Regions:
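Active-site acidic/histidine proton-transfer and metal-coordination neighborhood
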Residues: 1-70, 79
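Histidine-acidic metal/acid-base catalytic patches
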Residues: 1, 41, 53-158
Length: 158
């Protein structure tokens, strides 16, 4: 994780408070994976935490509360996997027991474009590994027919 251990400890303390707050209201607290792009313009420095499955697993273990989980943004994941060279599918499989939801969109692996996708999208088979996780389709500048085709692709995969 970028930054000092102090940054992580502050994040951990905040997540514990937010998880307890959510649990008291009958909901889970989820944290979304961040994207890391090769074009971020930060001279190769990582400015955001929670990009890799190792970082997310560490936080999950340290929080140690079933009321805390992860929300996988597959667009962010595609960008980070492209930038860091890790396996996207293994990332999801590693975190599957903790996944509380998905944000679904397609992109070129460099920029988070929120493009429509079809039944053949790389992440579609993985949705079956987390059948209770809600999905949100995130599209930008999509035509109505693209939105409906994307919706149907997701419905068919569940």
């Amino acid at each position: 994780m970028p930054g000092s251990e102090d940054v992580y400890e502050r994040l951990l303390a905040s997540v514990k408070v937010l998880t307890a707050h959510a649990r008291a209201r009958g909901v889970r607290f989820l944290i979304e994976n961040h994207p890391l792009s090769t074009i971020a313009g930060h001279e190769g420095r990582r400015l955001l935490p929670m990009v890799t499955s190792d970082e997310l697993c560490r936080l999950l273990v340290d929080v140690g509360d079933p009321g805390f989980g992860v929300l996988i943004d597959v667009g962010h994941l595609n960008i980070s996997a492209h930038a860091l060279g890790f396996d996207r599918v293994q990332f999801v499989k590693t975190l599957a027991p903790f996944i509380g939801g998905f944000h679904l969109s397609d992109n070129d692996g460099i920029v988070d474009q929120h493009r429509p996708f079809g039944r053949d999208a790389w992440f579609m088979p993985l949705l079956r590994d987390c059948p209770r996780a809600p999905v949100t389709i995130e599209l930008s500048r999509a035509r109505t027919d693209e939105i409906l085709q994307t919706r149907d692709a997701v419905a068919d995969s569940l």
